[in-house]
Amino acid sequence: MPIGIPKVPYRLPGGQSQWIDIFNRLALDRIIFLGREVDDEIANAIIASMLYLDSEDPEKDIFLYINSPGGSVSAGLAIYDTMQHVRADVATMCVGLAASMGSFLLTAGAKGKRTSLPHSRIMIHQPLGGAQGQATDIGIQAKEILYTKDRLNQILSERTGQPLERIERDTDRDFFMSAEDAKQYGLIDQVVQHRPV
């Protein structure tokens, strides 16, 4: 039986309390949680949250916690572009799994603020795609996915400091890493053992 989304108490001005869902409570502390596959719906919610939090206070970090198997490249790139657009630093943390577009977003965090819990797994690979229809349409789709693959590899190379040739080789197939391996690779900056007080 599913437990649903937990509700937690929130103290209103004046001393009264009300129960709100935990994700809304986390958002009050500038924490956004990506805990599912990346699609247009979750991308729009994350983008809207980042834009709002940035307009509220561009000097305070936004925290993006990631436990995601990946998903839509276009939706993920929309989140990536927003992370680079907002004035506030976006600190990222892997909590469980950051695979495919999930790992791309993990690496997109502000340099020095990309972290992972010690037993998390991080996986990079090339984008997946498929096409059907007339031969000309399939050719158009093939060119587009190759362009996307090249662009993602270039960004990963820039964000990690790895040579483009290594990124191309490593993303040719699923490439899993431990948190410590991801740190050595340049996907993250720190493996977090304990939360700072």
Swiss-Prot record:
Swiss-Prot/TrEMBL keywords: Cytoplasm, Hydrolase, Protease, Serine protease
Stored Pfam families: CLP_protease (PF00574)
Keyword Hydrolase: yes
Top EC class, one word: hydrolase
Enzyme Commission (EC) number: 3.4.21.92
Biological process annotations from GO: protein quality control for misfolded or incompletely synthesized proteins
Record's catalysed reaction(s): Hydrolysis of proteins to small peptides in the presence of ATP and magnesium. alpha-casein is the usual test substrate. In the absence of ATP, only oligopeptides shorter than five residues are hydrolyzed (such as succinyl-Leu-Tyr-|-NHMec, and Leu-Tyr-Leu-|-Tyr-Trp, in which cleavage of the -Tyr-|-Leu- and -Tyr-|-Trp bonds also occurs)
GO molecular function list: ATP-dependent peptidase activity; ATPase binding; serine-type endopeptidase activity
Protease is among the record's keywords: yes
Localization annotation: Cytoplasm
GO cellular component: cytoplasm; endopeptidase Clp complex
InterPro entries assigned: ClpP, ClpP/crotonase-like_dom_sf, ClpP/TepA, ClpP_His_AS, ClpP_Ser_AS
Active site as annotated: 100, 125
Principal localisation: cytoplasm
Highest taxon above the source species: Bacteria
Family: Belongs to the peptidase S14 family.
Record's subunit section: Fourteen ClpP subunits assemble into 2 heptameric rings which stack back to back to give a disk-like structure with a central cavity, resembling the structure of eukaryotic proteasomes.
Function: Cleaves peptides in various proteins in a process that requires ATP hydrolysis. Has a chymotrypsin-like activity. Plays a major role in the degradation of misfolded proteins.
Protein name: ATP-dependent Clp protease proteolytic subunit 1
Organism encoding this protein: Gloeobacter violaceus (strain ATCC 29082 / PCC 7421)
Taxonomic lineage: Bacteria, Bacillati, Cyanobacteriota, Cyanophyceae, Gloeobacterales
